[in-house]
Curated annotation (Swiss-Prot):
This is tRNA pseudouridine synthase 1. Formation of pseudouridine at positions 27 and 28 in the anticodon stem and loop of transfer RNAs; at positions 34 and 36 of intron-containing precursor tRNA(Ile) and at position 35 in the intron-containing tRNA(Tyr). Catalyzes pseudouridylation at position 44 in U2 snRNA. Also catalyzes pseudouridylation of mRNAs. The keyword Zinc applies. GO terms for biological process: mRNA processing; mRNA pseudouridine synthesis; snRNA pseudouridine synthesis; tRNA pseudouridine synthesis. The active site is at residue 146. It catalyses: a uridine in tRNA = a pseudouridine in tRNA; uridine in snRNA = pseudouridine in snRNA; a uridine in mRNA = a pseudouridine in mRNA. It comes from Candida glabrata (strain ATCC 2001 / BCRC 20586 / JCM 3761 / NBRC 0622 / NRRL Y-65 / CBS 138). InterPro entries: PsdUridine_synth_cat_dom_sf, PsdUridine_synth_TruA, PsdUridine_synth_TruA_a/b_dom, PsdUridine_synth_TruA_C, PUS1/PUS2-like, TruA/RsuA/RluB/E/F_N. Its cofactor is Zn(2+). Keywords: Isomerase, Metal-binding, mRNA processing, Nucleus, tRNA processing, Zinc. Residues 1-83, 507-549 are annotated as: Disordered.
Length: 549
């Protein structure tokens, strides 16, 4: 503001007062101004003397705030850095989620975003002045992943300093090997990666021995077998699983005496304070489990069972009410409706030193709810291993509430977010489209080294999938999980909480006639309709595409 000399102020004030006096003298007498008007007039006069309106002067005074310097961890002032321009960018990333409490920033827990943000600051992509607040940098993620979940491709958007042509290499140098930056692309200021993401691809890796039927003597196995007697013809006869367990029993008889086998089956762990890992019987139990795990990893899935699993997964295609596949959603909640665009189940492949067989399931959907994919995988796997009609999945989209357990997080990874519709707008404004396929070779190598190998190794060491399905098989809705022997002894008073997998079906649904006969009739009618449909029929093309996937 231009300074005014004291004599100039006096001159202005004098002229103003003279002007007011002359104006008052030349007019007829009037009522005195109210006090608030007088004070406002006086303020205007003062402001004229200062050379600025009163309101502007007040705002100017308010802006004169003394800012305290930012301090480092030791309490020393952080020197100001030169201000460099920040640009709105999309950062393509991949990471192994092992050891992290999910993607989202959540101090003091280690998260992917915390590691990324630190690397951005250390590399100079974010100034130290803005290093304590993600919001200052307009930080946003395309997809949030939970604890332990991996991503071959994910995307974050934020404002960054990208003048340095080597900024991406510098960021990667400050990141652990399990987190990588694939690329940094300029985007327009309005870009919001979460809202602009049109769909997402997820992958789930599943060992095929997860599809072996429940172990004989468990609660779930007993429920399934008894329901077959009560309602014959509803469930498939799983001769493949029956043969597997018979072969294991034969192998066990070669390694253990009848007395040892009986003692092992009767074994229940003592209280923690009395536990002795050197006890002879406990060592025998460990040998039994080792033999069972070795036998399980030698399992190779049949084409019939794999096709059953594929048919179960295809039940999810299209728009459905997934209220049973998440937490805290009611049937009438419109947000429970989700659309699955494409599902692929790979051919089996053998990998790792253990030579176990796996399949890859890829799911392309517009959006997903909490635990939805893990519950989808779990339901389809339970359907295939129990011989249950695949139509139970479509029935689970109805209003009846059922308990679907969530499969282990170990096999889940985010393949990539998709920005199909927004890419057209980006190109229109002169920006490059967001396309993860450009980095596919690097992403695949990273996934094999830092994600797939860790999944395989963790399953071999911890038997995550076997532990999960063993827990499901022996779960009792009255007393919780129990051993096969205690389940057998309490058989009349126990029933699996997963009764919907048995021939009885989902409670509350009137199946009328034999469910399998009805589904066979529907399949026959569908086949007739397909054969009679014109060659250009779109539904027929859609079915063909689904079968290929």
């Amino acid at each position: 503001m231009e300074e005014v000399a004291p004599e100039q102020v006096q001159e202005v004030q004098g002229n103003t007062e003279a002007h007011i006096d002359s104006t008052t003298a030349s007019t007829a007498p009037t009522e005195a101004l109210p006090s608030d008007k007088q004070s406002r007039k006086a303020n205007e006069i003062d402001s004229m003397a200062d050379g600025a309106p009163a309101e502007k002067k007040q705002k100017t005074d308010q802006r004169q705030i003394i800012r305290e310097p930012k301090l480092d961890d030791n309490g020393n002032p952080i020197p100001r850095e030169p201000r460099l321009p920040k640009r709105k960018v999309a950062v393509m990333i991949g990471y192994c989620g092992t050891g992290y409490h999910g993607m989202q920033y959540n101090p003091p827990n280690p998260t992917i975003e915390a590691a990324l943000f630190k690397a951005f600051v250390d590399a100079g992509a974010i100034s130290k002045a803005n290093s304590n607040d993600l919001k200052k940098n307009n930080f946003m993620r395309a997809a949030r992943t939970d604890k332990g979940v991996h991503a071959g491709g994910n995307l974050i958007s934020l404002k960054m300093i990208i003048e340095d042509p080597e900024i991406m290499d510098k960021i990667n140098a400050n990141l652990p090997e399990g987190i990588r930056i694939w690329d940094i692309e300029r985007v327009n200021k309005a870009f919001d990666c979460r809202k602009m993401c049109s769909s997402r691809w997820y992958e789930y890796l599943l060992p095929t021995y997860s599809l072996i039927g429940p172990k004989p003597g468990t609660i779930l196995n007993n429920d399934i077998e008894s329901s077959k007697t009560e309602l014959p013809g509803v469930l498939d006869e799983d001769l493949e699983s029956k043969e597997f367990w018979e072969n294991f029993e034969a192998a066990a008889k070669k390694e253990f005496t009848p007395e040892e086998i009986a003692a092992i089956k009767d074994y229940s762990p003592p209280p923690r304070e009395e536990f002795d890992d050197q006890e002879e019987l406990y060592q025998k139990v460990k040998q039994w489990k080792l033999l069972e795990n070795t036998h399980r990893r030698q399992y190779r899935i049949s084409e019939m069972k794999l096709n059953k699993f594929r048919a179960a997964m295809n039940q999810y295609l299209g728009a459905h009410n997934f209220h049973n596949f998440t937490l805290g959603k009611e049937f009438k909640d419109p947000s429970a409706i989700r659309f699955m665009k494409e599902i692929k189940v790979s051919d089996p492949f053998v990998i790792g030193d253990a030579k176990a067989e796996w399949v890859s399931i890829k799911i392309h959907g517009q959006s997903f709810m909490l635990h939805q994919i893990r519950k989808m995988i779990s339901m389809a796997t339970l359907i295939a291993r129990c011989g249950t009609p695949v139509e139970r999945i479509s029935q689970a989209f109805g209003p009846q509430k059922i308990n679907i357990p969530k499969a282990p997080a170990l096999g889940l990874l985010l393949e990539a977010p998709v920005f199909e519709s927004y890419n057209k707008r980006l190109e229109k404004f002169g920006y490059k489209p967001i396309d993860f396929s450009k980095y596919q070779e690097k992403v695949d190598a990273f996934k094999m080294k830092h994600i797939y190998d860790k999944i395989y190794a963790e399953e071999v060491s911890d038997n995550v999938f076997n532990a999960f399905f063993s827990y499901i098989d022996s779960f009792n809705k009255v007393t919780g999980a129990q051993t096969e022997e205690s389940a057998e002894s309490n058989k009349p008073a126990t029933k699996s909480i997963f009764e919907f997998l048995s021939a009885h079906g989902i409670p509350g649904i009137d199946y009328g006639k034999n469910e399998k006969e009805d589904s066979n009739k529907e399949s026959s009618n569908d086949q007739v309709n397909k054969e009679s449909a014109p060659a250009t029929s779109k539904p027929a093309e859609a079915v063909e595409q689904t079968e290929k996937n």
